[in-house]
Structure formats: structure tokens, C-alpha cells
């Protein structure tokens, strides 16, 4: 079954979805296909996760992916790697201060193509 993205106008997001689908196919990793399908849905269905929630449920060294935005409410004390579509300005500043790594979803998928030990937060 192919995933076609016809309703998205944001070229960067379309490329992100296509990249996730390609990585999923090459490595038989269902997690990246799931992320692509979530992003292909309407924007109203995207997740918006605050830093305090990531800090509450993550452990040091975890890889967290968010099919949506990471917002800057709360603080983060754990050293985690976060992949998301968008990071708010406040979240970016707090992540830099705390020493966390943050990147796009396709970069996380390229770094971990099998998707092992990756947690999805919604």
C-alpha cells in the first residue's frame, strides 16, 4: 500500500513524509511508516507536547519522536534526543540550555533506521 501526499502544500513537510516512507521501506521499520501516516493526516491531528511531559516520561538517553510540535512549557532535566516536525522558540532555547539534542524526524530516522528504542509521544 502506497502513501500518497496530495493535500499538503508545505514542500518541506511533503519531503519529510516521503523520506520517512523511504527509510521505512528500506529497513522494514514500521515505526517510520507510522510517523509518516500521522504526518499525512490533517494538521489538527498533530501532537503538541510540552517539555514537562517529555521530562516526566523519558529517561536519560532516550530517543523521543513527536509527530507534531514540541512546546516550551515546563523544564527538562534529562538528556534526551528529540525528533519533531516543529520546535517552538521557547522549547529550542530550553533544549539548548539543558544540553539535549533535537532534530527533524527524518534525521532521527537516518540515525536510527531500524527504529529500535524509540518512543513516540502524543
Curated annotation (Swiss-Prot):
<dbReference type="InterPro" id="IPR036227">
    <property type="entry name" value="Ribosomal_uL15/eL18_sf"/>
</dbReference>
<dbReference type="GO" id="GO:1990904">
    <property type="term" value="C:ribonucleoprotein complex"/>
</dbReference>
<keyword id="KW-0687">Ribonucleoprotein</keyword>
<dbReference type="GO" id="GO:0005840">
    <property type="term" value="C:ribosome"/>
</dbReference>
<dbReference type="Pfam" id="PF17135">
    <property type="entry name" value="Ribosomal_L18"/>
</dbReference>
<dbReference type="GO" id="GO:0003735">
    <property type="term" value="F:structural constituent of ribosome"/>
</dbReference>
<comment type="similarity">
    <text>Belongs to the eukaryotic ribosomal protein eL18 family.</text>
</comment>
<dbReference type="InterPro" id="IPR022947">
    <property type="entry name" value="Ribosomal_eL18_arc"/>
</dbReference>
<keyword id="KW-0689">Ribosomal protein</keyword>
<protein>
    <recommendedName>
        <fullName>Large ribosomal subunit protein eL18</fullName>
    </recommendedName>
</protein>
<dbReference type="GO" id="GO:0006412">
    <property type="term" value="P:translation"/>
</dbReference>
<dbReference type="InterPro" id="IPR021132">
    <property type="entry name" value="Ribosomal_eL18/eL18-A/B/_CS"/>
</dbReference>
<dbReference type="InterPro" id="IPR021131">
    <property type="entry name" value="Ribosomal_uL15/eL18"/>
</dbReference>
